[in-house]
């Protein structure tokens, strides 16, 4: 995760880029080559970039209620920083110092943590940037090709300011479109699968446990993947309200619908990730690792592969959530999570 000595530097940089590309293009480049209606649409789209960006910065991601108590038959996650229980899919944000409902990641470019409540605003910002900069990039490509075709004409026929800005803005707009586009695709794909970036990392960790026969393949299935459109609507709300600056996600960020892999044959909810063990803050862990697995209807020898006690401890330490890295070298802390939960 990118970090800055002053976190607001991460906000100032996009502001400079957005202002420079949108303002100078609207004043010096586009008026000479597009209709007034097209220019007006570009200005409106640029305004929506600013509006969605400001909202993504100031709207909090959502935190659990102070009086939250876990259901008796559900998983019990406890935050040592907040000294309180928290709902499933909730993590403690190191930057904000609070637990965040359905936390996705901490974004240095908004200086805000993306969670259940502000995910639609964050996604709206990405989409408006992609559309606005994508349009500008196409227009710049057309303009540069025309300038190349007319390169033999006298220089006094060209507006030098426009030519210089077009040449500079072409690679700049491509860079913005490429980088933001990759992030948009990543977030959208996760959204389609009903998963957050943190949970995607978690799935990679669980898959490594399956390969080492530390976790059974059945228990590795992700329980929150319901159906394509249900997943999308749960994350960003109705497609009719998504384009509105105040559009909200579905649900409360505390309880979530699960697929069949999230329940036992008797209909009891299963914990995910599967190596989670409940914790009692008043005493000691409610169960040790094996007892916790049995409580969830699993046989420890099946889950832990029948390895010896010493090797089991070494394997367990290596695959702990605060130690493990994926193939890209990312740790849980790289998503802005302060690992204080048990």
Curated annotation (Swiss-Prot):
A Gene Ontology molecular function term for this protein is: protein-cysteine S-palmitoyltransferase activity
Single GO cellular component term: endoplasmic reticulum
Query: Which top EC class applies here?
Result: transferase
Q: According to its UniProt record, where is this protein located? A: Endoplasmic reticulum membrane
TM segment ranges: 9-29, 39-59, 125-145, 163-183
UniProt keyword annotations, A-Z = Acyltransferase, Endoplasmic reticulum, Lipoprotein, Membrane, Palmitate, Transferase, Transmembrane, Transmembrane helix
Q: DHHC domain spans which residues?
A: 77-127
Q: Which residues lie on this side of the membrane: Lumenal?
A: 30-38, 146-162
- In this protein, the active site sits at 107
| Enzyme Commission identifier(s) | 2.3.1.225
Its membrane topology is listed as: Multi-pass membrane protein
Hey, which family's this protein in? Belongs to the DHHC palmitoyltransferase family. PFA4 subfamily.
State the HAMAP family in the record.
Answer: DHHC_PAT_PFA4
Q: Can you say what this protein is called?
A: Palmitoyltransferase PFA4
Which organism is this protein's natural source?
Answer: Yarrowia lipolytica (strain CLIB 122 / E 150)
